[in-house]
Amino acid sequence: MAMMERPEVLETTGGKCWEHTFEKFRLKVYVPDNNLDGQVNNYGFRAPLLLVFEEEQQDMDSAVRFARESGLAKVAADSDSSVLFVYPTAEDGWAGAGADFYAAVIAEIKMIQVYRDGIVENYDFFAREFKGYFVRGAIFRADIYSFGKSADYVAKNLLTTLQGEYLWGPGEITPAMCSMERLSVLPDVRRKDIAVISAGNSEEINRAFDGCEHLLVKAEASYEADYYGFVKKFKMWCGRIEYEPDFPALNMTEEAGFVTVDTSPDNRSPFKDEKTHKVGYFAYYNNGISDRGPVPLVIGFHGGGDSSMYLTFVAGWWEVAHEHDFLFVSVENHQFVTATEAVQVIGELKKRYNIDERRIYATGFSMGSGKTWDLYQEYPEVLAGVMPVSALFPVYTSFFGAPVSERLNKTVPVPVFYSGGEKSHVPELPRQADSALERIQYVAEVNRLKKKFGEVRFEDRDSWENPLWGLSGDRTEQVPDPSRGSTLTIHYYDSEDGVCRTAFASVSEQVHECRKHSIENAWKFISRFTRP
């Protein structure tokens, strides 16, 4: 169950702390001080979820001392994270912890942008409903540290595929790494890809780990060194162990920054009464990219409940930027940023990087698609093209719900590659909602398509020429995605001047998500266009 009241946060040595007792476990959280401005640049997606399974329940002072002396506090501080100490509420401790204990822990952890002191606020944007406080953390980066009795529990119960509450609902919650010290039982290893640290264990126990794909055997744990040398690279994403990219090895740069913008009159976020506010971003580019002259810029906007790193790493924009040699800048907390302010960010980026002003593109997933559409309809002269994904927002209001009639673009064509999932539960395709059809009709009008979408009626969708879009493209292409067993079907629409600058695509078997296959095909189409 979520915490409906915010826990009391106390000052402690080198940071802050708080605690809470849930039904199945007691939790202590230590949030070490750091030099990062996590409210501007959100590091949560790549931050480790450091779970210390206490052998015996200890007080807060002892927990803080362990975090600091072990180096785990330093690991947490380096990524604006926390150290979590967990102990069962069962009367006989770990011996009484059931198989569902870990799922109960994970159910109280969420990765949401709005957070403070290691606590996130879960507010449903669409339902306008507060759903409680949760522990901040990335459950796909769960690193478990266990000792003696707690290690025995891990060895018997957690080295297997586990189900529970994942990011978007029920799903796999298998940990990325399990560290076990002073085991007294042979581990039951039913899954070989989980990263394992075996420290201070017998040769017999260590032999039981033979066959593990990611194994570090040590006489004694060295937590900070082990993290940076072994643990850091692992994440368990959607049931598969994956490696985080090593940007120096790839000859790439990942760079955090922010721009101070003048708050625009249409900003309805918590910054609406501030004269200025900060907009954070992370930039990704190949080293030496500017040596050959000005470079294309793709500015990206993440989905609701996500962060800039989600768009970068899950959608794979960093890989597309690496492979196709452009600058990718992912904006943080854009839900607090208007289109006017986003243009200010672009203006400042042009001062910091050698950007080709004729090749500036925008993209966004879900709620970030809404921000991309805002730029299309309010500032078309800035962009050479847009690549919104998985959301067809209403036309005549901004992301904040404010009318934009004064700035609504009606005359400036902007190249578009839009893609949506055929099995999504949100309006991603015209067939799914009349507001989605309205967006397509608007693009058709602005880009002056030969096909007359204005004649398409939502109520006639069962008899549409094309069951998803209403009208088929002048040309159609099907691009298989073998990695997901799906097909990207692209409809290309010609404008009245004979130029094809509009592509609407659907992805079979896709729900509400953003895939590298789709965005890379979007880039291949959009990158051909430049501003005059």
Which sequence ranges carry the predicted segments?
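A domain-start/cap signature at the N-terminus of enzymes
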Residues: 1-49, 97-108, 118-128, 140-166, ...
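A conserved short beta-strand
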Residues: 164-184, 188, 381-396, 414-415
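Alpha-helical scaffolding within the catalytic cores
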Residues: 65-73, 182-189, 309-318, 345, ...
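Acidic catalytic loop of the alpha/beta-hydrolase fold
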Residues: 201-203, 422-428, 511-514
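Alpha/beta-hydrolase
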Residues: 52-54, 180, 301, 389, ...
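Conserved acidic catalytic loop of the alpha/beta-hydrolase fold
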Residues: 101-140, 341-358
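Short substrate-entry loop that stabilizes the transition state in hydrolases
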Residues: 36-47, 52-95, 289-295, 300-337, ...
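Short beta-strand/loop motif that positions the catalytic acidic residue
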Residues: 196-199, 417-420
